[in-house]
C-alpha cells in the first residue's frame, strides 16, 4: 500500500514541478515534441537524486522539452510496456518514438547534453 499521495509524494520525490503520469495519460503526453519520462519509485535513493536533477533541468529548458514521471509501483502497465526493470530509468521521446533510454543517475550537465541532441 502506498501511504504517500499528492503533495506528500511530491515532497518526498523532491520533484513537484514535473507531473506524475498515469496509464491513461501517458500516450497523449509523449505524442508530440521532445519528452523526457523519468521512471522511478519512492523507495529508490538514486531516483530521489535524479528527481532533483530533472527538476533543475526542467526549470532551465522546460519550454523546449516536456518532462513527466511515472511511478513504477503505481503504473506497472507502463513500466512493462517499456521493459523498465531497473530504476531510475529515463526515456526520451521525440514525436512519440523513443530516441534514447538510459538507466541510473546522471549529472545535470549530462542530462542537458543528452536532451540537447533532440531540441
Q: What does each model-identified segment do?
A:
Residues 2-33, 117:
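N-terminal leader/targeting and pre-domain segments
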Residues 25, 74-78, 110:
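Short acidic active-site motifs
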Residues 32-36, 51-70:
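Conserved helix-turn-beta segment immediately C-terminal to the redox Cys motif
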Residues 33, 40-43, 86:
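Short pre-active-site segment immediately N-terminal to redox-active cysteine/selenocysteine motifs
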Residues 39-53:
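Conserved redox-active cysteine motifs that mediate thiol-disulfide chemistry
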Residues 76, 82-91:
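Structural micro-motif
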Residues 86, 92-119:
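Non-catalytic, surface beta->alpha helical segment in thiol-disulfide oxidoreductase systems
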Amino acid at each position: 500500500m502506498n501511504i504517500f499521495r499528492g503533495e506528500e509524494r511530491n515532497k518526498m520525490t523532491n520533484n513537484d514541478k514535473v507531473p506524475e503520469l498515469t496509464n491513461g495519460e501517458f500516450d497523449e503526453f509523449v505524442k508530440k515534441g521532445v519528452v523526457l519520462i523519468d521512471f522511478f519509485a519512492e523507495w529508490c535513493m538514486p531516483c530521489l537524486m535524479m528527481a532533483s536533477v530533472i527538476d533543475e533541468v526542467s526549470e532551465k529548458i522546460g519550454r523546449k522539452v516536456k518532462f513527466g514521471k511515472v511511478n513504477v509501483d503505481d503504473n506497472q502497465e507502463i513500466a512493462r510496456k517499456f521493459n523498465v526493470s531497473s530504476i531510475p530509468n529515463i526515456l526520451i521521446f521525440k514525436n512519440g518514438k523513443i530516441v534514447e533510454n538510459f538507466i541510473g543517475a546522471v549529472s545535470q550537465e549530462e542530462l542537458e547534453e543528452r536532451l540537447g541532441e533532440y531540441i
